[in-house]
Amino acid sequence: MQPMFTSPKPETKLLPGFTSELHHFVFQSFLTFPKRTQTETNFHSPLNQNLPSIPFIPAAMAGAETDTDTSKAKPRPIVRLGIFLISHSFFFSVVFSAAGVLALLLLPVLAKNTYISENSLMPGSVAPMLSDQEVAEANRLIDDLTALNSKPLGSVIGSRRLVAQYMSNSGAEVSFHKFHPQINQFHPLHFFSSPDSRRIEQNVSCALHGVNTVGIIRAPRGDGKEAIVLVTPFNSAKVNKNEALSLGIAYSVFSLLTRVPWLAKDVIWLVADSQFGEYAAVSAWLRDYHTPLFSGLGTIDAEMCPESNNLHGMEENHFTERMTYDGFKRAGTMAAALVVKVGDRAHQYEDSLSIYAEASNGQMPNLDLINTVNYLAVHRQGLRVKVEKLRSFLDMGWLETLGEMFELLGHYARSINPQLKFGIPAAEYIEGSATLASSLYYQALGVPTGPHGAFRDYQVDAITVEILPKVYTLGNRRQNDFLLRSGRLIEGVVQSVNNLLEKFHQSFFLYLLTSPSKFVSVGVYMIAFVLLVAPLPMVAASLFVNASNSDDSLNTEKPAPSATAADSAPLVTAYESSPLLSAANSSSLATTAGCITLSSWKWLYAAKKSFVVYLWGSVVSLLPYFICQIPNCTPTTSFIIWVLLSILSLVVMYMILASPFSDANNSRSQKEWAILKSVTMSAAFIGLCLMSIINFATAEIGGLLIVPMCLMAYPLKLDVKTRSLRTISRAACNLVLGIVGFPPVTFIVLKGAFEGYSSISVGDFWSWVESLWVWNSATYLYIGVVHLPSWVLCIHILFHHC
């Protein structure tokens, strides 16, 4: 058929100020004009001289042209990529999950050497000034403290008075800080309270109090706006040899700093009374330091316990009496803090130094602080620096095999290109894996590994250094050498922090340690987490589209998918029959997607089930608050009561909010379990992502447990009905994952693997959970609000009626 018009189509130009939609509307309106006698019609009126020349085309032909242009329109690349991933969700879920686990195992290989980012620190740039004179003064303090142990009467006040006297003799300002131990009891609002919130205990006994001794050196070159804190915990009731040594080390440095001319920041020496715990003493002092009370509590307290408020009555030394103050003394903003301890265990070969850095909820100090201590200890004082590691990892055969494989791959890579630095020795890989696992564990636990954790609540970078002598019993000469090396290390750290012009900010705050001199930054370890959780949204979208497509087929009286297709994989995918894929090849993408959303309201029932279960998880998390009110309750009894109340609360919620396991109106849907699984995976994905912001280590370990359980969840009834090797294997894997994924079972398995199964009891899980809520660890909320509900929903999918 010959075309109606042979004249070429003129180029269409948009009018100035016209949008494309308005121009299209004008063009369509023109097409509806009555038929003219001429073959072409143009506007030639004076008012339309600037309009383009538009040929007259019949409406039918114009409609055909419009459909052709629309059919050629393709979705955006990001939409096409999403459709492609959803259509192949089974393949990509396997690839991404395996890649996530592999990336986690590769972290020790990908670790980088530490370096100091802040140039102003300049560790080791100045020769140490600590001499034998300061060491001799420290030895006198150690001897005096040791002699007090033979005097049971008055030794508590005597040790405090002695330390205060030495501080005052060095020229520092001395004050005492009295505190009462707080009762650690579960309370749901404590998870959302700031560290400066306090409770005033009623009927406080004078016997239950501690007294911190505080000495402050005012910097001759400073303005009093910044300070460096040294902390030495000691038990005033019974000072042992190690505590006396730690006090001697700190005093040798403190007495030196009172005479140096270069000090630009105030120095605070906190002798923390650790008879109620090291953390409690430091936390109480920090709380009062940052949140002063303007009330009469101090007067009331002095009247209640007058003997504890006359600690500085030293008649024999008028200079000491003049330099001791009753009020709470303060210095400037804390730039950094260092907790100094002498370890109980002796090292066999050489003096060593252990660094503890983990604070509450996985918070870490700036990496520059650890690097400074490590550099000065290794390169200036010849100390062997160690960080904690999980000893059980050192004896794992599969880890050794994996390390040998990475070592061979490294040799092969260097044979191809000598510049490639992939691969490390197998022994180094095992050590790095054990250290990395320890770093992940303690960060995920959310419990501080020392009194330094109290400083992170106030955004102060702090670590605990535990110095371990080569032999436990030190002679005079050996003790002098030990005090000199340890004191010069602390002096070097103070010098470096004193050089800072601003707070630590150059280096990393989010990292994992594989050794004292190697770390994995957040940009590297987040790759493993992203790869691990990436299958959850893909498979959730695939399940939802597939289930909606099946429901649409049933509603239009089309044959339902075959049983073979339904049982082909636990991750239901739809590539050839997916509405999204067909929409990508046609002009009805938005229309088709809209129909799926509007016609598939079945997900609301699954959302209701998930909401009820997650609400139940929140109730379970609050039950320990009431269980703690029961007097004389053992951990085993408390755990049993917790389990019974959890089951009872689920039954009550079933009666009030309707059963989360009821069919409702979904009896016609053959893919109800798929929609429920889709909602479960979406909720688990959101929970893991939110937890990664609060505590990455908890999210990583939780993802290793939840992601396989969510991906593999499939009704056992369908697997048993098919009775093939693949379905039976899948059912067995689901049962194993379901058992191991239950939080108490997970705890028992991990504790048995690391410590042995001989001493495990049912009440151990309650004791572990109790330690989490006492320290306000977000891991406790994760277990109750994210992990437990996801586990219950996966178990429901396994036993779905289908």
Regions found by a protein language model. Name each.
Residues 9-10, 21, 163, 167, ...:
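Generic low-polarity alpha-helical segments
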Residues 10-12, 37-41, 47-50, 66-68, ...:
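Low-complexity, intrinsically disordered Ser/Thr/Pro- and acidic-rich segments
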Residues 314-320, 450, 517-519, 552-557:
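Short secondary-structure transition/capping segments
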Residues 114-509:
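Soluble extramembrane regions of membrane proteins in the secretory/endomembrane system
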Residues 1-59:
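Intrinsically disordered, low-complexity basic segments at termini and long loops, enriched
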Residues 60-115, 521-802:
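Alpha-helical transmembrane segments of integral membrane proteins
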Residues 442, 466-550, 788-801:
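His/Asp/Glu-rich mid-to-C-terminal helical/loop segments that flank catalytic regions of hydrolases
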